[in-house]
Amino acid sequence: MNRPLAIAFTLLVASTAAQSQTQTQTLTQWNFNSVTPDASTATGSLLPNVGSGTATLVGTTGSFASGVGSTDPAAIDNSGWGTSGYATQGTGDRTRGVQFNVSTVGFNLIAVSWDQRLSNTAARSAQFQYSLNGTNFTDFGAVFSGSPGDTWFNNRSVDLSSVAGVGNNANFAFRVVAAFEPLTSAYAAATTSSTYATTGTWRFDQVSVTAVPEPGTYAMMLAGLAMIGFMALRRSR
């Protein structure tokens, strides 16, 4: 293969690779598994296994337990993030749960998904909330309802692509919090034959934020490739 043709082929491959980066990709993900596998689901990590971000508790206490039943493909050492210590019945609507902070700088068309397990006495309704400044949160969409308890509800998802300010935002954050049943002032237990209790638990796994690079990012990639091609052709003469 002559030099100009080799250069053209290389640029074509690089351009195809760059274009693939404009497709939806996982920006950040938490699988809550131990960074160093230890064959114990009672241990885990709040560090993302993909990308960067922080996971924190909102008025609850946390622990690690088995993630078996979620979409996590890990065959062993599959942990989930368990939470308990939810509000007394009739109080604290949408104030307790979990929070995740993820910078979306350079990305748009943001979407969030997660797997969630509810114990029998846990609140069956969960509200998704988002924040543009990491402090003030806004409800988004209807509550997620899950029944019966002791069950994983996988691939819960929200599409935030229509919300101005979510993309390209260093302070983007979101929460999943326990909610009263719609049009009531009380929590309902995940299993209808059970009674809601503050000791009920929620467990999370495979919390993921997906996004698409902004057009400007792709344009810079192509500009860089064009410059590489120009310099390579110049040297080949």
Features from the language model and the residues they span:
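N-terminal signal peptide c-region/cleavage motif recognized by signal peptidases
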Residues: 13-18
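A short, hydrophobic C-terminal helix/tail in secreted or cell-surface proteins
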Residues: 214-233
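Surface-exposed, low-complexity/disordered Ser/Thr/Gly/Pro/Asn-rich loops and linkers
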Residues: 54-105
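Extracellular carbohydrate-recognition regions
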Residues: 21-61
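Extended extracellular/luminal ectodomain segments enriched in beta-structured repeat modules
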Residues: 104-113, 169
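Extended, low-complexity, turn-rich repeat/linker tracts enriched in Gly/Pro/Ser/Thr and Asp/Glu
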Residues: 106, 117-124
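Terminal, low-complexity interaction segments
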Residues: 25-36, 137-211
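Conserved Ser/Thr-centered positions that define the repeating blades of beta-propeller domains
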Residues: 128-131
